[in-house]
Amino acid sequence: MVTIRLARGGSKKRPFYHLTVTNSRNARDGRFVERVGFFNPIASGAEVKLSVNQERVTYWLSQGAQPSERVAQLLKEAAKAAA
């Protein structure tokens, strides 16, 4: 099954996540089909906290991709910010 989920990056104590489209059987930070955005939970000031390529996310959801629980929350947040 194809999922949209977070892949962790950054360094120790400074997490940074990429929103990736991947096969659910692949490792968390392993091979992916496409990166569709990023999430920086410790962004402050003028730094961008969340960036989502809404067009590509809509495409993958129409193809049957399932977002993880956290990604579903982030997509709602991004849609709310865009409106």
Curated annotation (Swiss-Prot):
Q: Which GO terms describe its cellular component?
A: cytoplasm; small ribosomal subunit
Q: Which SUPFAM superfamilies match?
A: Ribosomal protein S16
Keywords from UniProt, A to Z, are: Ribonucleoprotein, Ribosomal protein
Q: Which family does it belong to?
A: Belongs to the bacterial ribosomal protein bS16 family.
- Listed PANTHER family: 30S RIBOSOMAL PROTEIN S16 (PTHR12919), SMALL RIBOSOMAL SUBUNIT PROTEIN BS16M (PTHR12919:SF20)
The protein's matches in HAMAP family, at most eight in alphabetical order, are given as: Ribosomal_bS16
Protein's name in the database: Small ribosomal subunit protein bS16
What organism is the protein native to?
A: Pseudomonas entomophila (strain L48)
